[in-house]
Amino acid sequence: MATIVQDIAIESGADDVWDAVRDVGAVHERLVPGYVLDVRMDGDTRYLTVPGGAVVRELIVSVDDDLRRLAYSAVEGFRIPLTHHHASFQVFPEGDGHCRLIWTTDVLPHEMIDQVRPRVVRGAQVMKETLEQRAGR
């Protein structure tokens, strides 16, 4: 399994960042506006509409407020031929008004890592910009 880890330093408090991350039905508004266009929830299943109109179906695996950790798995609607996708976000406080957001993504087949990595890197950039802008930074 190939793994991508994004360690994102964010100029915003951990509680505020976690509140946005855990709001799984509003990622298109609170985390990655423009990168995800719309979200529809059906229980623990999230449907993301992305630019171009594709719909990605994800299972929300865990939302752990104590650990500030969200785990999810994309299971359908890939633009690239993946057989497995699992990812997690975890927020760590780093002093007043700062935190780290660790985004870990595992994919199969291994060979797809070079196609997945730029999407994750861009998503991390959009998240950082969005969260810091909302924090007034």
Language-model region placement:
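Hydrophobic/aromatic beta-strand elements that line small-molecule binding cavities or substrate pockets
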Residues: Q6-I8, V56-S62, H85-P93
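A short, structured loop/turn motif at beta-sheet edges
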Residues: E11-D15, V61-R68, V91-R100
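Hydrophobic ligand-binding cavity/cleft-lining segments
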Residues: M1-R40
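Beta-strand/loop substructures that line and gate deep hydrophobic ligand-binding cavities in soluble
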Residues: G77-E129
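A general secondary-structure signal for short beta-strands and their flanking turns/coil
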Residues: M1-T3, G53, L67, H84, ...
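Short beta-strand-to-loop capping motifs
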Residues: I10-S12, V50, T105-V107
